[in-house]
Amino acid sequence: MPADAARLATAFATTPPLVVLTSNRTREVHDAHKRRCLYHWLQHPDFDREVAILRRRLPDVTEQLAREVARATAKLRTLDLLKPPGVAEAMDWATALHTLGARELDPDVAARTLGAVLKYREDTDRVHAMARGALFGGG
């Protein structure tokens, strides 16, 4: 036993702890573990909520850019992608765009920064093959 560990006291919880496990379903969870869990499925936030999240977490990102990123991310989620983007990817994308000095999400800058929001090459290739304007143009 290390000398430092001998000085530490053992802590006991006065009430049973509440443990929250999250999963993006990238790995299978063993059946024995699943039987001991309660499940609550979360949906992606609606447009206004996602814009609010982006603005709160990334205050330097303009309202317009936050709205365009939220709109484009919602459109990407409707596609048959291996990994549809979540809020974390939307935040990564908005951060990358802001860092590059983008004031709006036009089709060209969107195409150049897809790696921030799409994590699989097949997804990026699929989006590049589509009409970019339909995904990243205005409303």
Which positions does each model-derived feature cover?
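C-terminal regulatory/interaction module of P-loop NTP-utilizing enzymes
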Residues: 1-139
